[in-house]
Amino acid sequence: MENKIDACLHLALCQEHLGHTEKAVEALLKSFLYDSPRGEACCELGRMKMKEEKYREAAYWYTQALSSRPAEQTGAFVRKDCYGFLPSIQLCVCYDRLGDHRRAWHYHLKSQKLKPEHPSVRQNQTYFEHKLKHPAEGQPSAL
């Protein structure tokens, strides 16, 4: 089962590289036939939707990634960031682009707890401090 899921993920990357976006999406969705959705597949779907600037759809897939659990006990190749940090930081971007700054801030704080020194987290902190004019600690005053 895990080999089939992993094959779907690799096939999706190959299809996307060849410019076959729909086939890439199909390969990712096919992985759901073998077991519950993996964070890796959900993050890839979210990334593809962000690339198309479909931020609401991207947010859906990143939210699914956050609610999924890694299949570590099955011997699967697990990218741990796909179950916490990556969906959180990408949800911050999605909600900011959708104009929902309160949710964007929420996911920024979540990503900040996971990797406070990550360059993207630090950049987002500076962005929010400038954009929303809030103190470095606590919630932005504009929210």
Tell what function each PLM region has.
Residues 4, 11, 38, 77-80, ...:
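Residues that mark the junctions of alpha-helical repeat units in TPR/alpha-solenoid scaffolds
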Residues 21, 55-56, 101:
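TPR-repeat structural position
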Residues 29-33, 64-67, 112-113:
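Conserved structural position within tetratricopeptide repeats
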